[in-house]
Amino acid sequence: MPPSAQDLPLGHSTGSETPIRSSVELGAVIRDQRKRLALKQLDLAGLGNTGNRFIVDLENGKPTVQLQKVLDLMDLLGLEVVVRTKASRSASAP
């Protein structure tokens, strides 16, 4: 039987951070987390009330996926987006 949303690790943060600079990198992080949770793409699609095609596109880094759907799926997987100012590359940069 596929897992339910109650089975997922909502709010259980390991404290790890991964800088994301592209849709491909974000897709890889989401794929890795889905696999860590032993979910199939179809399971995640069902839990997220979306189609399997969306999951495939997201995990493959399609840059035009719907942002709110991505955020909702990340929440289901126990992931979150944190925006912060980038550290300067060097003190002498203009």
Across the structure, where does each feature detected by a protein language model lie?
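Short alpha-helical DNA-recognition segment
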Residues: 38-56
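N-terminal flexible/basic segments that precede or flank functional cores
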Residues: 1-24, 80, 85-94
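Residues that mark the N-terminal boundary/hinge immediately upstream of a DNA-recognition element
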Residues: 29, 40, 66-69
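Flexible coil/turn residues that form the inter-helical turn or adjacent wing/linker of helix-turn-helix
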Residues: 26, 37
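DNA major-groove recognition helix of helix-turn-helix/homeodomain DNA-binding modules
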Residues: 49, 68-84
